[in-house]
Amino acid sequence: MQNIFLAATLLGAAFAAPQNPPTSCSAAPQPTGTGSPGTVCGSTTFTNYTVKAGDTLGAIAKQYNSGVCDIAKVNGIDNPDYIKPDQVLSIPANCVTPDNTSCVKPAPVITNTCVLGVGSTYTVKSGDSFSAIATSFNITLASLEARNPQIPNYDLIFPGQVINTPLCPNSVCDSIGTYVIESGDIFYNLAQSNNVTVGQLESLNVNVNVTDIHPGDIIILPHNCHNITASA
């Protein structure tokens, strides 16, 4: 009987003891860039969001009533056009004054009419347009259209269709090899650091989803494609 009384006493004490307050699910995550709730776009809370394949900052900002540039600022994103699957973003939600313009650089004027070194064909993906493909190769739309007279309507292309891209004569790449994707890699950065275009990478990696690459994936990567200097 004494043991039963002692057990009941201990059980009651356990229930009466003060407990640590539960962690709030709405607590703001620590931003990886700059800013804090109340200082970015008038937001009072941050929400964590894990990027999925096909996501854009514009769509994410709209979903959370945020601003593209506000999200970019908080997460230290230099180029708001490029995010990658599984990237975790801190989103300043319900912005009072969303910023969608200050971080957006004006589109460069493209004057190139051919592609350097490699990438003579391109396989159309879902959502592609002739204009977007030309931009990905850093060539003019007119030059891409001129290379594909077999297509009756440039506004009507379909996934899997192979189109031609104009290659520059007397141009080469220093090397074309394989590369193992590392954490943090995206096609845009790989193209920039190897002096090629995203379109060229897509051309050489038809079966790779450029918005959904993972560490350990192997891609074909050209390096430093350029015009050949005429011999003296």
Swiss-Prot record:
Q: Null phenotype?
A: Severely compromises virulence toward wheat leaves. Produces no to only a few pycnidia.
Q: InterPro entries attached here?
A: LysM_dom, LysM_dom_sf
Query: What CDD domains does UniProt report for this protein, alphabetically?
Result: LysM
Q: The LysM domain covers which part of the protein?
A: 47-91, 120-165, 177-221
Glycosylated residues: list them.
48, 100, 138, 195, 209, 227
Signal peptide bounds? 1-16
Q: Name one Pfam family in it.
A: LysM
What triggers production of this protein? Answer: Expression is up-regulated during wheat leaf infection.
Q: Which UniProt keywords apply?
A: Glycoprotein, Repeat, Signal, Virulence
Annotated PROSITE patterns = LYSM (PS51782)
Recorded domain comment: The LysM (lysin motif) domains are small globular domains involved in binding chitin in eukaryotes. Mg3LysM contains 3 LysM domains.
Query: What's the further remark here?
Result: In plants, chitin acts as a microbe-associated molecular pattern (MAMP) that is recognized by lysin motif (LysM)-containing plant cell surface-localized pattern recognition receptors (PRRs) that activate a plethora of downstream immune responses.
- Identify its protein family: Belongs to the secreted LysM effector family.
* Function (record text): Secreted effector that enables the plant pathogenic fungus to manipulate host defenses for successful infection. Binds chitin fragments and blocks the activation of chitin-induced plant defense responses. Protects fungal hyphae against hydrolytic plant enzymes.
Protein name, as recorded? Secreted LysM effector Mg3LysM
